Regions:
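Transmembrane alpha-helix/helix-exit interface in multi-pass inner-membrane proteins
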Residues: 81-96, 163-188
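Membrane-interface loop-to-helix entry segments
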Residues: 122-137, 206-225, 260
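Interfacial segments of alpha-helical transmembrane regions
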Residues: 65-72, 138-173, 237
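Membrane-interface helix-boundary motifs at transmembrane edges
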Residues: 2-6, 29-35, 54-66, 145-156, ...
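Interfacial helix-loop-helix junctions of multi-pass membrane proteins
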Residues: 178, 210, 243-269
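Membrane-interfacial alpha-helical segments at the cytosolic side of multi-pass membrane proteins
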Residues: 140-147, 216-234, 264-273
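N-terminal transmembrane-helix/juxtamembrane module of multi-pass inner/ER membrane proteins
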Residues: 2-42, 62-137
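Membrane-interfacial catalytic/cofactor-binding modules of polytopic membrane enzymes
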Residues: 169-229
């Protein structure tokens, strides 16, 4: 009962997605199931951490921080799981379809021509710096909001987590990798941010889940929430949001159609999340 009283709306999203992925794996055929049983163990551990953080939550103690930040952190784990499980329904990706759409929109795909035409190692690094900044603006504006207004923070995290989870489900039924295979031809080893991004993708971001771009969706949502909270100072976040949008294409992580779709879903989920939060925040 104490857990029920302390639980917030976002906790139900985390609990559902933990169990959702676990159930999907458990109903697979035995040989396939064994390949992914580590995800079941991870999700049960995540579910346990969630319950403990809710149960142990006291005002401003360690578990209070864990409780409120855990849903956003969980997205890092669930992305890896969803992009790994994206071949359960369709063995092949829809990249050929997306590449054709991309060509219809831009003619020559932008990811093939931007870096070669600009031909600047400095701009290549700058674009990868913007792409890397995604991992900062996902957390830094939220941290400032958390320290000033926890109610608004809960609204923001609910919206972003809802967007991520529904996108992850979509990735599992519509697999796509994006033009990431072009990166080695376009960028070489680089100096700072290019090798950093190679390192990140080597550890956890193994590719997949490219359409729509959650980098674009999430950064746009962070900007929209920041605009409502910080108002005049939100332009700082806006610069990074615009930079991330350009970088997704320039750095050959996404087709143009991926990033445009990310703008649309980011805006739609911002509206949807606010509506759902206002309606259900007191129901749980």
């Amino acid at each position: 009962m104490e857990i029920r009283k302390k639980a917030i709306l976002t906790d139900y999203l985390v609990a559902f997605f933990c169990l959702f992925i676990a159930v999907i794996i458990l109903i697979l055929e035995n040989q396939t199931r064994q390949k992914y049983m580590n995800f079941v163990s991870i999700n049960l551990l995540l579910f346990l951490i969630l319950l403990i953080s809710i149960r142990m939550d006291r005002e401003r103690n360690f578990w209070h921080w864990v409780h409120l930040w855990f849903p956003l952190i969980s997205c890092l784990f669930f992305y890896v799981e969803a992009s790994t499980l994206d071949n359960l329904i369709f063995p092949n990706t829809f990249d050929s379809f997306l590449a054709k759409l991309d060509t219809q929109i831009t003619g020559t795909p932008l990811y093939k021509i931007l870096s070669p035409k600009i031909n600047s190692a400095l701009i290549d690094e700058l674009m990868h710096a913007f792409y890397f900044s995604y991992y900062i603006i996902l957390f830094l504006p939220a941290l400032f909001i958390f320290l000033k207004d926890e109610k608004f923070f809960k609204r923001m995290i609910f919206g972003i987590v809802l967007m991520f989870y529904i996108h992850y489900f979509f990735f599992m039924i519509f697999p796509s990798d994006g033009p990431i295979y072009m990166r080695d031809k376009l960028f070489g080893n680089g100096r700072i941010f290019i090798p950093i991004m190679k390192l990140i993708y080597g550890f956890g971001e193994q590719g997949g889940g490219a359409f729509p771009s959650t980098h674009v969706s999430a950064s746009l949502m962070v900007y929209l929430f920041s605009r409502n909270f910080f108002r005049r100072r939100a332009w700082i976040v806006g610069i990074f949001t615009a930079g991330i949008f350009i970088a997704t294409i320039y750095c050959s992580y996404h087709y143009t159609i991926d990033s445009l779709a990310g703008l649309i879903t980011g805006f739609l989920f911002f509206k949807l999340a606010n509506s759902l939060f206002d309606k259900y925040k007191n129901y749980f």
